[in-house]
Amino acid sequence: MKISDGIQQSFKNYIQSLGGKSIESYDKKGGFIAIGFDLNIHGQTVPLSVKYIDQKRWLSLPTVSVAQCNLPALDHVGNNGLICVTDHQGEMFDSADLFGLFKYAVDTAISILTNALESYSAGNRKALYEEIDGYNQTVVSDDPIVIATHNPNQSDSLYAWCINLTKQRNTPQCHHIKYLVDGASQHPPSSNPYTAIKVTKIILPRIENFVIPNLFTSFDEHWWEQQTLNFSTQQLDSLNKKSKFKIVLLEIPTPKMRTYLVISYYQDMASNKYRNFKIQTLQRGWREYLLNRTGMESQFSSKKPVVIAGCGSVGSRVAEILAESDVDKLILVDYDDMKTDNIMRHYLGIQDVNQSKVSALKNRLQQNIPELEVVVYKTNILNWLNSQNDEQLSEMHSIVLATGHPPTELEVCRRYILTRRMSKLYLVG
């Protein structure tokens, strides 16, 4: 059921009691209502908007945003103007107490803005710098994030995998950046529409060298010009040596970790103006970081490859699980092509029918985990083992037998376990 007119009016009355001006409500998509108003906070007239769902019970708190402008200079205010009022609280509340929840959200937002404006007026950016990693994830840009499949701090040669969005010749280049990879070992697969572009890495010596925009400004070309004033001569030289289309990885040191921004633009050398300027946040997607977050201990610390013999319904799922663990390299062995009969049980799908199982599985795994090395052999496991000498086999961590053919699996056991040419063999399925 919808909120009564009396409760709606109580919301407006409360805003008016706080000194709110130009109060008006309007319907939003999806059954939401928003109340917009102006409020003087610490000497600044700030346009605010409170959005809530038009129901008699609320399962989530109203959202409070700065309307019609961005305030990236302020603590806890996102690039889209959203004010963080919950701080992971509010899961336990009376869903029927609409006025109480409305009042809590508005009061908390005003308190946050008051403190943030006081800090800004005093030139105090300490809170922003202390939470710079989370700050960058929420306030810098609404553009899609870039996924780093390799730790940028451990690479001297970084490349961006991009999709070229340039529509016409002789126009400023524009690219959609998808991945950031270690250039020494990774290149875009030819089957994908990616272009590899060299990345310039700029490391700031101190966190205070990161420029936070002033009030009512945002992260744009003017911000970048201010940021480059903090670069060393050597850093500026490395930046200017690159092509007209530039991709820069800005590394910001923090007490706990390094945080990163990806800046891309086309620089018109004649006018020295920036075209297609874009700033994106970086999502950590390299294996060590993800495993540390999950608390998993690696079972493959030797970094030796794992062989999967048979890439059917069982073997393909084993490959998926191993790819998401700490395995750096998989060797896939299967002589068969994908059939429609396999679709309901297989990791692959209808789009892979009539393709080699090992090739299709390799493409699917590397789409999800680009840094994973996958080597494929379209043959049966016995032929593959016969092609390997003892030294090559000793380099394998283990073989997973998922052929679904007991005579073949027994023969592998007889030849390579009983003769101790392999130390680990797993039978699945």
For each feature predicted by the language model, list its residue ranges.
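A structured beta-alpha segment of the ubiquitous adenosine-cofactor-binding alpha/beta core
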Residues: K362-S398, T403-P407
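ADP-ribose/adenylate-binding Rossmann-like module
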Residues: S398-G429
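Glycine-rich phosphate-binding loop and adjoining beta1-alpha1-beta2 segment
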Residues: Y335-E371
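Compact alpha/beta protein-protein interaction domains typified by the UBC
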Residues: G20-H88, G100
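Beta1-alpha1 glycine-rich phosphate/pyrophosphate-binding loop at the start
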Residues: I202-R206, V211-N214, K329, Y335-M344
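Glycine/serine-rich phosphate-binding loop and adjoining beta1-alpha1 elements at the start
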Residues: G134, T138-K304
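Domain-scale recognition of soluble eukaryotic interaction modules
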Residues: S65-S155
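Glycine-rich adenosine-cofactor-binding loop
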Residues: E297-D337
